[in-house]
Amino acid sequence: MQSNAENPRKRFTATSPNGNRQNVSVDTSSNVAGPSRPRIANAVPAEILDDPALNQAIKSILPSNYNFEIHKTIHHIRKASASCVALQMPEGLTLWATGIADIVERFTDATTVIMGDVTYGACCVDDYTAMALGCDMLVHYGHSCLVPVDQTAIKTLYVFVEISIDPAHLAATIRANFPNDRHDFRAKILGGSQSAAGKRSEVDESAGRAQIQIGEQASVASGAPPSTLTHLALVGTVQFINAINGLREALRQQQHRLADGQIVSTESPVDRLMLTAGTASSAPVQHITQAAKWKAWSSGEYKVTVPQVKPLSPGEVLGCTSPKLDKDEIDAIVYIGDGRFHLESIMIANPRIPAFRYDPYTKRFVRELYDHAEMRRMRGEAVRLAQDSVGGLDLDPETSIVKKNKAVVVDAEKDRVTASGWGVLLGTLGRQGSLRVLESLSASLSEHVPPIPHVPILLSELSPQKLGLFGEHLAAFIQSSCPRLSIDWGSAFAKPLLSPYEAAVSVKKVKGWQEDVQGLGMSRTPAKQQQDGNGNGSDAVPAEDKHLPLDGDYPMDFYSDTSLGPWTPRHGMAPAKKPVGAKSNLALLRSLRSKRAKASSTPTSAATA
């Protein structure tokens, strides 16, 4: 079900079998134990949901395809008896900030404050500033609950702002472009039968030439069940989580497209005779002309995965946090959202899986590429420059593994005096700064031999001009605000700007990443070749190193509960894994309810007998 401002999702509203809302009551007259009923303490009252004035205000002020959850917001403000409410949202939603403020002040007794500072993500929730302004409640729009509500300084309500899109067009776009057979997908979409290592077989040069085939014959061939289903991983921003779940269900069932363009989910109808594009020989089709592309409809089911990296929602990715996928299982990543910032995160974490982006606003579907080798080289160079400022360490240019120099440092005191200091930047924009990360970084620098002098610096936003004011006194900087600042903009700074992970690599707390390796970015061309002494070609690019963390890939796990080390804010917060064969909490709850249901039916059966 699509949700919008006129028809908000009533996830906490109880309904009767006929669809009418009603109060839920528990019958306590019976002494027979039965399944417990869920509490609905946060249910939005009917007088708010059905308020004609409120609904008219929402309809006239806010866009219908954006769900700002106004009813729930009004309910929570009234319930908390809030007197001053702070509204915080990213710049893309600021257009409606004044309208939301007017609605809140009209239908509650609270005043509002619009927080105009830049909001890059969920890490920027600014409850401390809101409290300093005298607000007793904060409504944060557009991001997930990265900072739990029980850890904020004042009462905080997160509104994801789910955006309604065209689900039929989204599913049809996938089926019209992606064969559901893995071999056909790799041949037609990736340009050959490409392995996870980046090697491919040659593509038939005659694939682009069209041949007339009879529709009945083509349908017989296309109707054959695939040997292996195309495996897609669906991800996106939090605004499109519902769209991701809907797409998953649509791709897990058969959908047929008739000659007139109509899409049905029933059994495949009898195809009319039609002209289709094919090859001049009996070889399988490798490329399809644009005119006949819509006829390459894949009506079968796909294998679909919606990955999750906790504490994020299933399918959700952040610019700094994305799941690590199995490159031998996943054939493609499908990202739903506009822009590349969040998509690049999962591309960096999974460089050997091709990525495609569906823009729900323009309805364009494109393949996105990323220069992994260049990024890794630049970040490796930044680590080496930082190491050179203190000496005693070097970085292997091929594997980026930190190792000791051959020259042994004898006079550690001299090195300690001549070594340049490092600046450790703690972000103060919202909740970006983490004292836990600062303590971990400071301890790593102090434990280094020789110890690296460092000074903590508090900054809300970084810029080359701001850090340039420190002159030559600091040789390198470590910033804990966002890893993407170092990855995307590190080259713009005069001194190395390391992320916490890169700092850990530089002081030998963890082995690093490989800079140039086979298969990065699923390149369509074979790996680079070089001539050996005998004139024979040999691979100049090494294979991935299984002995390195994440097989030598660059991690994107900054807010993951299962991150690599203590240089991330939530390291070690993942719950302990259950023993093999142990039941999950959900399974135990279902088992308990089943036992209660059986116990409640036993006396009735005995009385009847």
From Swiss-Prot:
Binds 1 [4Fe-4S] cluster per subunit. The cluster is coordinated with 3 cysteines and an exchangeable S-adenosyl-L-methionine. It is found in: Cytoplasm. [4Fe-4S] cluster binds at C123, C320, C482. Pathway: Protein modification; peptidyl-diphthamide biosynthesis. GO terms for biological process: protein histidyl modification to diphthamide. Residues 1-37, 521-547, 565-585 are annotated as: Disordered. It catalyses: L-histidyl-[translation elongation factor 2] + S-adenosyl-L-methionine = 2-[(3S)-amino-3-carboxypropyl]-L-histidyl-[translation elongation factor 2] + S-methyl-5'-thioadenosine + H(+). Its EC number is 2.5.1.108. The keyword Metal-binding applies. Keywords: Cytoplasm, Iron, Iron-sulfur, Metal-binding, S-adenosyl-L-methionine, Transferase. Residues 13-33 have a biased composition (Polar residues). One of its GO terms (cellular component) is cytoplasm. Its cofactor is [4Fe-4S] cluster. It holds the Pfam family Diphthamide_syn. GO terms for molecular function: 2-(3-amino-3-carboxypropyl)histidine synthase activity; 4 iron, 4 sulfur cluster binding; metal ion binding. Its main location: cytoplasm. The keyword Kinase does not apply. Catalyzes the first step of diphthamide biosynthesis, a post-translational modification of histidine which occurs in elongation factor 2. DPH1 and DPH2 transfer a 3-amino-3-carboxypropyl (ACP) group from S-adenosyl-L-methionine (SAM) to a histidine residue, the reaction is assisted by a reduction system comprising DPH3 and a NADH-dependent reductase, predominantly CBR1. Belongs to the DPH1/DPH2 family. DPH1 subfamily. Component of the 2-(3-amino-3-carboxypropyl)histidine synthase complex composed of DPH1, DPH2, DPH3 and a NADH-dependent reductase, predominantly CBR1. This is 2-(3-amino-3-carboxypropyl)histidine synthase subunit 1.
